[in-house]
From Swiss-Prot:
Pfam families according to UniProt: Leader_CPA1
Known role: Arginine attenuator peptide (AAP) that has a regulatory role in the production of arginine-specific carbamoyl phosphate synthetase. Encoded by an upstream open reading frame (uORF) within the 5'-leader region of arginine-specific carbamoyl phosphate synthetase small chain (CPA1) mRNA, it attenuates the translation of the downstream CPA1 ORF. In the presence of high concentrations of arginine, ribosomes translating the uORF encoding AAP stall at the termination codon, resulting in reduced translation from the downstream CPA1 initiation codon.
Keywords for this protein: Leader peptide
Family stated for the protein in its record: Belongs to the arginine attenuator peptide family.
Protein's recorded name: Arginine attenuator peptide
Keyword Lipid biosynthesis carried by entry: no
Gene Ontology terms, MF aspect: translation regulator activity
Lyase found in the keyword field: no
Length: 25
């Protein structure tokens, strides 16, 4: 696991990654 507050992973990145994963199915 990773900490959102302790990384450069932003909400936008999270959403984009989620969309990419869901659309790749």
């Amino acid at each position: 696991m990773f900490s959102l507050s302790n990384s450069q992973y932003t909400c936008q990145d999270y959403i984009s990654d989620h969309i990419w994963k869901t659309s790749s199915h």
